[in-house]
């Protein structure tokens, strides 16, 4: 713009237009500037970036939400009153109740993909003073978990890759939660036979692994089938349950065969009615999974291609819905549904 102004001044033309343009430019710079990337979002509690993510924290009177996407995607949710979230964390709380012959308050729990610690916070609330530690690769998210999501200070969080952490420690756990799959971003090194074998080796006798898979698929050879088959080829007993109202699916795996029976016995003795109802729902909807031939290994784990296939399918389903409306009701009917 400076070069343009110099040019027109030298040509002795359009002086009034130059002055007006410069004033408008200055006015726009002063009034039109926003340091918020999501400029349409109001009243964000926090907005910033880390090495790995764009981060938003928003809150209401009831809850605090972390999102790592601008338009969509809730990565973590914390209920200020400490109740159930209605999300996959609630279903995953069945894992400690599947472990036989040990009080839940005495269990050691490891969370790979700690996020803001919602699962750890809920386990502490409902199961007592469990020994919980987490691994989270994004240190900024861990900082936010302490500041906004009430993660207890005595819950240790290591800033590290989940698989690298398992390679570095010899500790065994009663429950290992794998929650490192975000949207279509699935780390290949945490989706292979070799990785899940490593998880199994870090479980105590009777221990349970719970995996949060956040994309439903209903086609042969989709990403969920690859993950489930891979896990079922490592563990002797695998159960899955779909999370109501979302695309999440929880998968429970163990070497002991009485997971659901042990869960039912523990649920009968729960004192919290809300948690008890939630656990009964999970137990009733759990489906045994038999191993198939879709395997991912360190040498071949096409998670990006499989993830994009699911996204393409979701887009096609949405487009088909609106296409049917257009064909039946025309443009006016389509506009009414938007």
Q: What annotation goes with each model-predicted range?
A:
Residues 1-11:
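Membrane-embedded alpha-helical segments of integral membrane proteins
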């Amino acid at each position: 713009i400076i070069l343009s102004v110099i040019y027109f001044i030298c040509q002795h033309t359009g002086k009034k237009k130059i002055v007006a343009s410069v004033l408008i430019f200055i006015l726009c710079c002063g009034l039109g500037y926003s340091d918020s990337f999501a400029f349409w979002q109001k009243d964000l509690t926090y907005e910033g970036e880390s090495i790995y993510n764009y981060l938003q924290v928003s809150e209401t009177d009831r809850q605090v939400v972390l999102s790592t996407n601008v338009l969509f995607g809730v990565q973590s949710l914390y209920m200020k009153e400490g109740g159930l979230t209605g999300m996959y964390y609630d279903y995953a709380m069945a894992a400690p109740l599947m472990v036989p012959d040990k009080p839940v308050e005495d269990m050691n729990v490891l969370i790979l993909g700690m996020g803001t610690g919602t699962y750890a916070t809920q386990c502490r609330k409902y199961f007592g003073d469990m020994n919980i530690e987490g691994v989270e690769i994004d240190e900024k998210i861990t900082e936010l978990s302490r500041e906004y999501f009430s993660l207890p200070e005595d819950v240790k969080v290591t800033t590290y890759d989940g698989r690298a952490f398992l390679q570095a420690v010899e500790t065994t756990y009663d429950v290992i939660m794998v929650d490192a799959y975000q949207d279509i971003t699935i780390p290949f090194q945490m989706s292979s036979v070799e990785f899940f074998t490593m998880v199994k080796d870090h479980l105590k006798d009777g221990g349970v692994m719970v995996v949060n898979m956040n994309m439903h698929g209903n086609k042969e050879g989709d990403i969920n089938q690859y993950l489930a088959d891979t896990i079922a080829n490592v563990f002797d007993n695998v159960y899955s349950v779909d999370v109501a109202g979302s695309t999440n699916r929880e998968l429970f795996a163990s070497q002991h065969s009485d997971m659901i029976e042990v869960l039912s016995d523990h649920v009968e003795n729960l004192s919290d009615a809300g948690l008890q109802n939630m656990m009964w729902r999970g137990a009733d909807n759990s489906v045994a999974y038999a191993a198939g031939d879709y395997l991912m290994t360190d040498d071949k784990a096409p998670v990006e291609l499989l993830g994009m296939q699911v996204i393409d399918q979701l887009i096609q389903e949405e487009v088909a819905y609106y296409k049917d409306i257009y064909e039946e009701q025309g443009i006016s009917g389509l506009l009414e549904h938007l």
